[in-house]
Amino acid sequence: MYSAHSHQEGPGTPPTVDCWVFDVDGCLVDSLTGTSLRPGARELLTHLGRDSRVNLWSAGGGAYARSRAEQFCLDGHVSGYFPKEGRDAEGRYLTSHLPVDTGRAVFVDDRPEDLAGDLEVLAVSPYLAEDPHDHGLEAVALRAGLSRDELR
């Protein structure tokens, strides 16, 4: 996995990103009740959706991911919705069904161990319940070019 802290182009750093792939439950939406959006998620997706594709994927399926985006009025910033379907021999989710160049995509997930090691994955702490003091998306915001102040 690439480091979330590398911002300069050069050997060993990630290429320009044109797609962001976010897990839904536990990453953007609380996983216990599904009723709260993680602090900063709206600002982050709004920012990313201006210049990049933003995809949501979920073990609950693409329709489920879409319904969560609509629930929180995020659907205007999202390009596509996909299921997390199938795993490889090592138990990691397959990404071949996603319309992304995995070398130019960033995956954001609270279960980074479920993704292949050759992907750029930004791990976030699990968002379990509504918490207005949560800072779980800060590293993602920094990678996306947002300051902490812009995230709130």
Q: What is the predicted role of each segment?
A:
Residues D30-N55, E85-R92:
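Short, acidic loop-to-helix structural element flanking the phosphoryl-transfer center
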